[in-house]
Curated annotation (Swiss-Prot):
It is found in: Cell inner membrane. GO terms for cellular component: plasma membrane. It comes from Salmonella dublin (strain CT_02021853). This is Uncharacterized MFS-type transporter YcaD. Its main location: membrane. It comes from the Bacteria. GO terms for molecular function: transmembrane transporter activity. It is a multi-pass membrane protein.
């Protein structure tokens, strides 16, 4: 059976279009607010409302999938996201935009839960790594193309919203031509997110998603600031961020393939060790290109491998709940990491960004090594 079936390919095509829209809005919304002369703290609050929406959307999507299935949940999530986009055109104001970005955050989180859960339910122990690698490649490629679009088209609010909304609605079209079966509805008992978080045998995967959130959130949010403080121009900062993201895209498929072939545990250990090496190399400032490349290749691929580990520790009917727990863990890490790192950078030194990344990665590496004797490579439930 082929890994990349027709439903999988159509799902990833839809995700690519939706991610393009997400990337464009996430870049332009803060700029639109700044042009409207809103104070910085209000811009930050609007951004926080989006991530709060992510948390809320993550919590109830599993129940929605169980009730109405993958396809209808995907349509509903896309429509909620589109509503959050259209609402921005009404009036530029703090309270209104905070509300609309909260709604958009709910829709985006629902999309991620639906897509990730559908891929996990479609896969087996032999191909889940490659499926999640393809998912991350589509996500980062959409992010990259979204940034490219921002630099090429008009950034005016009323010029952007129509075609971004159209792109969101176009993201629904691929799934109109296929049906993703939800086998979870056949199970007698449903699982809760809290039960998945407490599952001892999946704890390494959950912890890996938290660490991944800390690492990626810190790199995405604070690497441009770090480079700015090194005296770089905006063009140079854009180049180095492109190197970082490109490394993450290029590393997805090889890491997924290696995880399927040699086991998640070995690949997780190597990834975390390489993140530590990349962080140390960034501190030396001797060779930024290779340091950023290996940091991106290892750091950006940690999440899908940790996900595959945790999901192979549960029964098939528990996959949606486990995926919710993992996305929630990643979101919490991506919120806490940048906040703590920014505080360290402001009060002490910019180098503490990489010291923090290396430190949390080292703690996770110790967990992976400590559990070597009692945590064998997981066997999937097919």
């Amino acid at each position: 059976m082929s890994t990349y079936t027709r439903p999988v390919m159509l799902l990833l095509c839809g995700l690519l279009l939706l991610t393009l829209a997400i990337a464009v809005l996430n870049t332009l919304v803060p700029l639109w607010l700044a042009q409207a002369n809103l104070p910085t703290w209000q811009v930050g609050m609007v951004s926080s409302s989006y991530f709060t929406g992510n948390l809320v959307g993550t919590l109830f999507t599993g129940y929605l999938i169980k009730r109405i299935g993958f396809n209808r949940s995907y349509y509903l999530a896309s429509l909620i996201f589109a509503a959050g986009c259209v609402g921005l055109g009404g009036m530029v104001g703090f309270w209104s935009w905070m509300s609309w970005r909260f709604i958009a955050g709910i829709g985006c989180a629902m999309i991620w839960v639906v897509v990730e859960s559908a891929l996990m339910c479609s896969g087996t122990s032999h191909n889940r790594g490659r499926l999640l690698a393809a998912y991350m490649m589509a996500y980062y490629m959409g992010t990259f193309l979204g940034q490219l679009l921002v630099s090429k088209v008009s950034g005016e609010l009323l010029h952007v919203l129509p075609w971004v909304t159209g792109m969101i609605l176009a993201g629904i079209l691929p799934l109109l031509f296929t049906r993703i079966v939800n086998q979870q509805t056949q199970a007698r008992h449903s699982s809760s997110i809290s039960a998945m978080l407490k599952l001892r045998q999946a704890r390494l995967g959950v912890n890996g998603c938290i660490i991944s959130g800390i690492v990626l959130g810190s790199l995405y949010g604070l690497m441009p600031l770090y480079l700015k403080h090194q005296g770089m121009a905006n063009a140079s900062i854009g180049f180095w961020m492109a190197v970082l993201v490109s490394a993450g895209i290029l590393g997805q498929w090889p890491m997924g393939r290696l995880a399927d072939k040699f086991g998640r545990l070995l690949v997780l250990r190597v990834q975390v060790f390489v993140v530590i090496l990349g962080s140390i190399a960034m501190l030396t400032q001797a060779a930024m290109a290779p340091a950023l490349f290996i940091l991106g290749a290892a750091g950006f691929t940690l999440y899908p491998v940790a996900m595959a580990w945790a999901c192979e520790k549960v029964e098939h009917h528990q996959l949606v709940a486990m995926n919710q727990a993992l996305l929630l863990s990643y979101t919490v890490g991506s919120l806490l990491g940048p906040s703590f790192a920014a505080m360290l950078m402001q009060n002490y030194s910019d180098n503490l960004l990489f010291i923090m990344i290396a430190s949390v990665s080292f703690i996770y590496l110790l967990m992976l090594l400590r559990n070597a004797g009692q945590t064998p490579n997981p066997v999937a439930h097919i």
